[in-house]
Amino acid sequence: MHQDTVRATAFAMPLTSPAYPVGPYRFRNREYLIITYRTDPKKLRSLVPEPLELSEPLVKFEFIRMPDSTGFGNYTESGQVIPVTFRGRKGSYTHCMFLNDHPPIAGGRELWGFPKKLATPTLRTETDTLVGTLDYGPVRVATATMGYKHEAADLSAVRSSLAEPNFLLKIIPHVDGTPRICELVEYHLEDVDLRGAWAGPASLNLWSHALAPVAELPVLEVVSAMHIVADLTLALGKVVHDYLPKSEPRDLKGRSHAFAE
């Protein structure tokens, strides 16, 4: 294969059969269970990268069911999202995500910088209760419950929240283990068709796990819960802050990730 062909066809790996297709990435009947809770402010500050800023010690634990997504298929994900501000604009920073489908893991990490790991989240309705669970291997690390459609939510407020910017810390290493890319990425949800949104009573329990440390942001108080169903497009992102300025060498001196023999 000629190198011009490589350049012309390069999108994702493997070159001849990428793990995920070119977008746009449209999601239909995307269902959210979002529980907002109060946590330890000192611990939260230690996990949110500058120049993002915190206003309140809040975390949103999300379970998202995606039965119909372009190129990514039918899957579920879960994770922690932190309300932040960036240059005076309110938004959300994605701290961690866990899902059960390889294409959105690969695409999410490589394109946007989503902090995705392989795990087993679920979101389902059990009689009168919306139930979200997250297992890492055989170990349960999160369980959420919410009364099913107890109260209609303010749709205009929900639309406004879905329109806010979202932020990711994208990290791609160089072949020697030093950071090749270390950027703050902003992305938005577009063409949102909000099908419904509801509030209700909720609970959230987290358990410690070495590789899925969601419990390091403990639940001190459940503040609110939201159940949302929408169609939307996940737009591509843009870089809003570079942690490795162009004036600095990308192979940072004094730092090594050489493998031990």
Swiss-Prot record:
Q: Name one GO molecular function term.
A: acetoacetate decarboxylase activity
Keywords for this entry?
Decarboxylase, Lyase, Schiff base
Q: What is its EC number?
A: 4.1.1.4
Which SUPFAM superfamilies does its entry note?
Answer: Acetoacetate decarboxylase-like
The source's superkingdom equals Bacteria
Catalytic residues? 116 (schiff-base intermediate with acetoacetate)
What enzyme class is recorded for this protein? lyase
Does this UniProt record's set of keywords contain Lyase?
yes
What is catalysed by this protein?
Answer: acetoacetate + H(+) = acetone + CO2
Pfam families in alphabetical order? ADC
Physiological role? Catalyzes the conversion of acetoacetate to acetone and carbon dioxide.
Q: Which HAMAP family match?
A: ADC (MF_00597)
Q: Which family is this protein grouped under?
A: Belongs to the ADC family.
Q: What is this protein called?
A: Acetoacetate decarboxylase 2
Q: Which organism is it from?
A: Mesorhizobium japonicum (strain LMG 29417 / CECT 9101 / MAFF 303099)
